[in-house]
Amino acid sequence: MDLTAPLADTIAAIATAVVPEQGSIGIVRLSGSRALAIAQAIFTPARRNAVWESHRLLYGWIHDEKGRRLDEALAVWMQAPRSYTREDVVELHCHGGIMVVQATLQQCLRQGARLAQPGEFSLRAFLNGRIDLTQAESVADLVAARSPQAAQMALAGLQGKLGQSIRALRQELLGLLAEIEARLDFEEDLPPLDVPAWQARLQDIQAQMQALLATAERGQLLRTGVKVAIVGRPNVGKSSLLNAWSGQDRAIVTDLPGTTRDVVESQLVVRGIPVQLLDTAGIRATDDPVERLGVERSQRLAQTADVLVLVIDAQAGWTEADAAIYASIRHRPLILVINKTDLAPADKIRLPPEIAYRVPAVAAQGQGIPELEEALEQLVTQGRPQPNLEVSLNQRQAAALRQAQASLEQVVQAMQAQLPLDFWTIDLRGALHALGQITGEEISEAVLDQIFSRFCIGK
């Protein structure tokens, strides 16, 4: 994102998703000092004496510069500072066809608006003090959320709960810094620093930081999810497992080996974790060129998945083909599903002892899915109890908080070494700077560019 783009420009963009499956409504958004003038140039209210009032919808028509009508629409003006960007904002609510929405946007540009860059509306909201940086990042997280838990976590961030926690820590550190600096400036007028009490407050701040850091791993998991590939030799029930797990008939199931020749994908949520579930072609040697391509693709996919689910047939037991597949993936996070246990018991099969996660199943009947989901959660969380998150740190925020922690550890070492108070202030300021990077009070243009460039246009 180009942060040198003039903030005085009035910007415009399509604010709703542009997808092949057209929605019923499409919104074009304007922000800037000329937003209202541009809207008035291309939108005529149906009622002749209608007055543009802030936060009131107007019904009318969008037209081109020659007065030719383009769409029947609604318009709403949000007068600064009572808008998302704290600038004048106008939204034009059109019918959802892409041609209509694009034509409306083009009229805005012809009247002098500049096409907004990705994230520029949210950047202006941040620069104008409407939101802090944690809230801006939560906007992107809310748009990208793939599970109810991720959406709730992003919403809490958007409401400012993470920013409030960070600012509270900052205020406490500022209080500690003020006590030291007062004694540096007015040493003769103040009693000596109560070091044990001061240190206890510092330890409390460190504990609060650690509690926030504990949310980062789970938060990242809820945001990004995991890719799970179902692998195994042909006809062991991989497609039946995908269908049972996803609750949909996504894959063709037959008694013929080699039916699945391409990767079949399904999206689901497992205990709050977004999962991209992939059913792959059965891995075996084959003379069929089409099936061989599917096998090769399955092998490549197995190397990129976060978790592999290896399916075997309880009737056949642990075969040489199973052992060969396992040998190629044994270094990866793995769950073994022993399928068709209604036909043969799983406990009679001799399996490699190092496979920790084993799930008996009858995929065709949907049996074993809860146990499989429990194994997946245990595997990706490494068995650690997972907090019920209200807010969580993303990777950037966690890195900054670790930097703040490291600075406070330097303060502790300075205290233990009985260094002068001046040395304490250096690292306290370092911790304050790191916390300011989280909320955006102290942030570089390069970091802002990195953050807002991942937004979609119109946000």
From Swiss-Prot:
Residues 225-381 form the TrmE-type G domain. Coiled coil: none annotated. PROSITE patterns: G_TRME (PS51709). CDD domains: trmE, TrmE_N. GO terms for biological process: tRNA methylation; tRNA wobble uridine modification. GTP binds at residues 235-240, 254-260, 279-282. One of its GO terms (molecular function) is GTPase activity. Binds 1 potassium ion per subunit. Mg(2+) binds at residues 239, 260. It comes from the Bacteria. Signal peptide: none annotated. Pfam families: MMR_HSR1, MnmE_helical, TrmE_N. One of its GO terms (cellular component) is cytosol. Keywords: Cytoplasm, GTP-binding, Hydrolase, Magnesium, Metal-binding, Nucleotide-binding, Potassium, tRNA processing. Its EC number is 3.6.-.-. It is an enzyme of class 3 (hydrolase). (6S)-5-formyl-5,6,7,8-tetrahydrofolate binds at residues 29, 91, 130, 459. Its cofactor is K(+). K(+) binds at residues 235, 254, 256, 259. Its main location: cytoplasm. The keyword Cytoplasm applies. InterPro entries: G_TrmE, GTP-bd, GTP-bd_TrmE_N, GTPase_MnmE, MnmE_dom2, MnmE_helical, P-loop_NTPase, Small_GTP-bd. Exhibits a very high intrinsic GTPase hydrolysis rate. Involved in the addition of a carboxymethylaminomethyl (cmnm) group at the wobble position (U34) of certain tRNAs, forming tRNA-cmnm(5)s(2)U34. Homodimer. Heterotetramer of two MnmE and two MnmG subunits. Belongs to the TRAFAC class TrmE-Era-EngA-EngB-Septin-like GTPase superfamily. TrmE GTPase family. This is tRNA modification GTPase MnmE. It comes from Synechococcus sp. (strain JA-3-3Ab).
